[in-house]
Amino acid sequence: MNFLAHLHLAHLADSSLSGNLLADFVRGNPATHYPPDVVEGIYMHRRIDVMTDNLPEVREAREWFRHETRRVAPITLDVMWDHFLSRHWTQISPDFPLQAFVGYAHAQVATILPDSPPRFVNLNDYLWSEKWLERYRDMDFIQNVLNGMANRRPRLDALRDSWYDLDAHYDALEERFWHFYPRMMAQAARKAL
């Protein structure tokens, strides 16, 4: 899962949206640096990452990547799940339009920015103003996201080519998304994530 899915599942679970978004920028035990609700959100994010990576649908999808891109498949798939969530938002969350949800999420996350790591603050400078969460529905934007990550981290250069794996398996990936994401939503609503 990437930014949008983590925020969405956190909302369904009444968990800290701030903690769920911040989690990738925090190493080790967050309890000494953040309030309890944010800490709980960080831990929820970590549990979701482990759970998602071990879902049969996701493990199957990783196998569809070519040898040269399989190493980055988990990252590429996380971004792709956000694509499907953004694309199908009106079906998934008919009572909370995406633009309104993004505004709500932004307001929640903004409260922790003064005490956040600089890299997280930098992400937030772009995430909201450039409307990344809404733009995830556009596959051209997904390609830009993958290229941007590859530019920032040369070790992940294979992300550029992983675009072709997404394109080649788009329909099958979308089908897998519909298999597992509604289950995760139900688990979030039961506070079982």
UniProtKB/Swiss-Prot annotation:
InterPro entries: ACP_PD, ACP_phosphodiesterase_gpbac. GO terms for molecular function: [acyl-carrier-protein] phosphodiesterase activity. It holds the Pfam family ACP_PD. Its EC number is 3.1.4.14. GO terms for biological process: fatty acid biosynthetic process. The keyword Hydrolase applies. It comes from the Bacteria. Coiled coil: none annotated. The keyword Hydrolase applies. Keywords: Fatty acid biosynthesis, Fatty acid metabolism, Hydrolase, Lipid biosynthesis, Lipid metabolism. It catalyses: holo-[ACP] + H2O = apo-[ACP] + (R)-4'-phosphopantetheine + H(+). NCBIfam families: PRK10045.1. HAMAP family: AcpH (MF_01950). Belongs to the AcpH family. Converts holo-ACP to apo-ACP by hydrolytic cleavage of the phosphopantetheine prosthetic group from ACP. This is Acyl carrier protein phosphodiesterase. The gene is acpH.
